């Protein structure tokens, strides 16, 4: 826990956020970093641009209402501050924070994952597991059951005035 986090009500149950000593990650004044090996893969950040491996790009976790989802964007409309590192070490982390979080996934420095949080008022949860699948299951226990799927993508679009 850093600063005085706003209770986003996204964590259910009695889970304890990471304190001063953080496994895997190096604490920095505005967030933290992780020294990656060449084979490390980065998963997560919810529905986002680019491929499943997030390495090599900068992502901004902030809710934006931009209808043009192109490869050169750094964020979409959702904010999913959950990431899994799979490689020399396999672990996940979740940042419970309602503001802007920037994930530099090896864009500035190919071998460094750098996470910057706009304010030091957030909870950081480290999730250890035997595999990425195990880490995802633990993450779901942390944040609870998935919400209902949106109806929009499940219906056929209709032109205005069509019957």
What are these regions (language model features)?
Residues 1-151, 158-161:
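Catalytic and substrate-binding clefts that recognize carbohydrates or anionic sugar/phosphate headgroups
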């Amino acid at each position: 826990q850093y600063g005085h986090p706003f209770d986003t009500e996204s964590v259910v149950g009695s889970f304890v956020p990471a304190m001063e000593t953080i496994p895997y990650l190096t604490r920095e004044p505005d967030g933290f970093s992780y020294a990656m090996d060449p084979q490390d893969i980065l998963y997560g950040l919810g529905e986002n641009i680019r491929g499943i491996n997030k390495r090599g790009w900068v992502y901004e976790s902030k809710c934006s209402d931009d209808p043009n989802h192109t490869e050169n964007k750094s964020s979409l409309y959702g904010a999913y501050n959950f990431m899994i590192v799979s490689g020399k070490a396999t672990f996940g982390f979740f940042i419970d924070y309602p503001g802007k979080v920037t994930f530099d996934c090896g864009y500035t420095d190919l071998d460094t994952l750098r996470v910057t949080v706009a304010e030091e008022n957030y909870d950081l949860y480290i999730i250890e597991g035997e595999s990425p699948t195990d880490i995802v299951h633990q993450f779901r226990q942390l944040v609870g059951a998935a919400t209902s799927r949106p109806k929009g993508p499940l219906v056929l679009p209709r032109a205005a005035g069509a019957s």
